[in-house]
Amino acid sequence: MKKKIVTILCLSSLLLVACGKTTNATTIQTTNDEVITDNETATTEDSVTDSDDVDLVLDTEDGILQSNETEISAVEVEQVEPLSYQTYLEFMMSQREPNTNAIFSSESLNSAFAIYAELLDTSNKEMFKAYLRNKDYLSYKSIDGLSIINRLWVNELKDFTLTRGPLVDKDIIYMMDMSDSAQATEFKNQFVSESTNGFITETPTVFDKNTFVDAMNIIYFKSKWVGGEKTLCDGLKEFENEDGSTSQVEMFCDFGDYIAKTKTATAYKMDYENGMSFVAILPNEGYTLTDVNIDDFINNNVEYEDADVYAEFPKFEAKSTYMASFDSFNLPLNPPFKEGLTICDTEPPVISQIAKIKFDNEGTEAAAVTEIVKSDSMAMVEPKPHYDFLANRPFIYYIQDYENDDIAFMGVVSNLAD
């Protein structure tokens, strides 16, 4: 029987692209001293009103501007087109250098968006929820092998009052003194390192006296393959890099029963012990990474076919750093805060993410830290068709979080040159 060679692009909660070089990853720094509970909520006569709508108050010593609420109609909210995984994939691809590997976590970014949305006026909060498909990211659960941590870091130099809401109920608020920038930043980095088992040790964000709030999400994943360690292939295998060059690399093999195909790409899935899955999407011959629509596979627009599949995958590592603004995702550049939340709004918030992955025959370890910082400045059985799924050229991948019905990571592998 003639074997079919399938190239795969794969995406997950952590999006990864393999192309060759590895890009540096960006992370967000945070620190925490104490948790503000409902019983410990402070009050400020000058800034807290009697309105039931006032949840947060943030005062600054100088340059105070009271945000004016911008009305967004219910019709406008209903017309919001939710952010798609393809949007995140295209963002990741646009931010990386050509012929480099990359990884990105849409789950982490959306969780940070959900935290920040709790600070916004009602109409903008509802708009953000619509962009996030009205999913309750603040209720996402950690499972064996997947840790999800949310934090809202608040500068202790700013008066802050929180009376109720999910940020209080879930103990997400942490206050810290940011007057000593080096100390505050180091404390934040230590927290990140401890939360990712040392996999990510620092982020690009720096805390200082001008920092108001930092909405942070940390996601850490580590799991072995179902069935144990995969078998290494005999000898080195050739990987065709994105730029047309080739590399001799170590690969491992796998045998599966299902494969999914579209006109432009083919997907193959491998399961982890903790119940999550790694899905690789390989562009078909004649197509490239940019021809792949990841939503076709994630949204189950393509059904998996019962087949006899032989697959090969390279070991790889990737690390990526991203800096962006809200308009990078077609969101309002600087949405106003809720009434009663006094904060300097001259500078729009900045988004940063650092993501990292290690993928081999034993399993996968991956992590991402996202920050949004606001600062001043079957009958008869037919014979199964046979396919070879050889990930020996650039492919996309993602790691699926079934517990929370989301994609934890997505990425690309395009260059395995030393």
Write out the residue ranges for each language-model feature.
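Non-catalytic, conformational "gating/processing" segments within enzyme and secreted inhibitor domains
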Residues: 99-100, 137-284, 304-381
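Internal alpha/beta scaffold segment
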Residues: 283-305
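Extracytoplasmic/secreted cell-surface and envelope-processing proteins
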Residues: 113, 122-128, 288-290, 320-322, ...
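Composition- and surface-driven signal marking solvent-exposed, interaction-prone regions
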Residues: 230-231, 291-296, 371, 405, ...
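Detector for small/aliphatic-rich hydrophobic stretches
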Residues: 19-178
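Extended hydrophobic
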Residues: 215, 262, 266-281, 382-418
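Sec-dependent N-terminal signal peptides of Gram-positive bacterial secreted proteins and lipoproteins
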Residues: 2-23
